[in-house]
A protein has these predicted regions:
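Flexible mid-to-C-terminal extensions adjoining Fe-S/redox cofactors in radical SAM and related proteins
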Residues: 186-299
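N-terminal active-site wall of soluble small-molecule enzyme domains
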Residues: 1-3
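Short beta-strand->alpha-helix junction loop in the catalytic core
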Residues: 16-17
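Radical SAM enzyme [4Fe-4S]-AdoMet core and its adjacent flexible, acidic
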Residues: 6-9, 25, 29-34, 38-199
Length: 299
């Protein structure tokens, strides 16, 4: 309600497991503009296995509620080794539930995805097969459904311009009140993130060390400092650099020019090698070829 009064667009990003009709109606009445629901696959058994709980049917019911309440629906699916071979069927499901927008998001290796890299990383053959399917669907559905294909970060020559550059346009406030330049910035343990209880958003944006640390180009080491792409991809992702090298200030190893590119390549090759050893256990069997570590609640 406060966001609507401030003239902001609000989008609920949810697993939808607890999204009842009453709750969705209340959110709409308060000014909610749209809803994004995450799906794991097209088939209930595979989807529930990936989620680690029986959630697929609840998501379908929630999607129906969203459409009946005439809220725009975004269908989001994270693509990885266990579900990417189902891409055609996943797109068909997005059409079936009446999505206005579909995000085909190749897995980004942060948080628990980073912990499970070997199990989640698609083969290069899977990616080569999937992209034309996504592009064909995007063309076919033009004017009916917006479709976004998020490129696989570990398989590109240059890194993504994460958040369009650190501290340039994005600000996030987590449930504890900490203010972050990107949703996963808390992965950088060497940075202190100021809290809205202690400082205003204006002060944090303009003056905090966390927002200024990687803002602009002055912080950049070589080869970023003299690279013609320095204001295109801004040195890549700081969180990814920290996760892969322990130092958030180095060139993102996802960049082919990074002196740390070998760290990423070794990780990718090790993951593929580990999966080859389990080559008889594939996503076609509705499971991962390697054990998956699920997040559990700690009390």
């Amino acid at each position: 309600r406060a966001a609507r009064e401030a003239g902001l667009y609000t989008n609920l990003i949810t697993s939808a497991v607890g999204l009842s009709r009453q709750r969705c109606q209340s959110l709409k009445d308060a000014g909610l503009d749209s809803v994004q629901i995450s799906f794991q696959a097209d088939q209930p058994a595979l989807a529930d296995m990936i989620a680690g709980t029986k959630a697929h049917q609840l998501k379908l019911e929630a999607a129906k509620i969203v459409r009946e309440l005439k809220l725009p629906l975004t269908f989001n699916v994270v693509l990885h080794r266990a579900n990417i071979d189902h891409l055609l069927e996943i797109i068909a499901l997005a059409e079936e539930v009446g999505a206005a927008r579909t995000e085909l998001a190749n897995v980004q290796f942060y948080g628990w995805a980073f912990t499970n890299t070997a199990a989640l990383l698609p083969t290069r053959e899977q990616l080569k097969k999937a992209e034309p399917i996504a592009m064909a669907a995007k063309e076919r559905l033009k004017g009916k459904m917006e479709m976004l294909w998020v490129v696989p970060d570990y398989d590109e020559q240059f890194p993504k311009p994460c958040m369009n550059g650190w501290g340039r346009r994005y600000i996030a406030v987590n449930p504890a009140g900490d203010v972050l330049p990107c949703p996963t910035a808390s992965a950088i343990k060497t940075l202190k993130f100021d809290n809205v209880r202690n400082y205003s958003l204006e002060w944090i944006w303009n003056h905090s060390d966390s927002f200024n640390r990687f803002r602009g180009t002055a912080w950049m080491p070589e080869p970023c400092k003299s690279c013609e792409r320095r204001e295109i991809d801004f040195g890549g992702c700081r969180c990814q650099a920290a996760l892969l090298t322990g130092d958030p200030g180095v060139t993102d190893p996802a960049c082919s020019l990074s002196p740390y590119r070998h760290v990423l390549e070794e990780k990718v090759n090790a993951a593929h090698k580990e999966n080859i050893l389990r080559k008889n256990e594939t996503s076609e069997n509705a499971g991962f070829s390697l054990p998956v570590i699920y997040r559990t609640l700690k009390w």
